[in-house]
């Protein structure tokens, strides 16, 4: 038997795979976006950029930007009754209007 991998990307093939249309798009605009505290964002992981990538469990979660931490942003995400904090690069975040 082969030992099962327990790395940070294990079990995430479907979540971290781009479609043909997504492979053609440029991500430079998403890399340069800026957020201010209080902005609502969705975590949308960009699989081609590994720096500042949040854990794949948080793919699709929404939260509020708490502040900047280095080149990344600290996002408060509600999981049940808890607020968990995810540190993610701006390329892995999308602004939610509203």
Swiss-Prot record:
GO biological process: translation
Any one GO molecular function term: structural constituent of ribosome
Bilayer-spanning residue ranges: none
Family assignment from sequence similarity: Belongs to the eukaryotic ribosomal protein eL21 family.
GO cellular component terms listed in the entry, alphabetical order: ribonucleoprotein complex; ribosome
Organism: Thermoplasma volcanium (strain ATCC 51530 / DSM 4299 / JCM 9571 / NBRC 15438 / GSS1)
Location of region: Disordered: 1-31
UniProtKB keywords: Ribonucleoprotein, Ribosomal protein
HAMAP family: Ribosomal_eL21
Disulfide bonds: none
PROSITE patterns: RIBOSOMAL_L21E
Protein name: Large ribosomal subunit protein eL21
């Amino acid at each position: 038997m082969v030992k099962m991998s327990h790395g940070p990307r294990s079990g995430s093939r479907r979540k971290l795979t781009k479609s043909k249309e997504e492979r053609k798009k440029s991500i430079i605009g998403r890399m340069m976006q800026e957020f201010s505290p209080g902005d609502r964002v969705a975590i949308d992981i960009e699989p081609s950029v590994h720096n500042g990538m949040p854990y794949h469990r948080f793919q699709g979660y929404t939260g509020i930007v708490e502040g900047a931490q280095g080149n990344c942003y600290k996002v408060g995400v509600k999981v049940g009754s808890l607020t968990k904090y995810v540190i993610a690069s701006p390329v892995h975040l999308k602004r939610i209007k509203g």
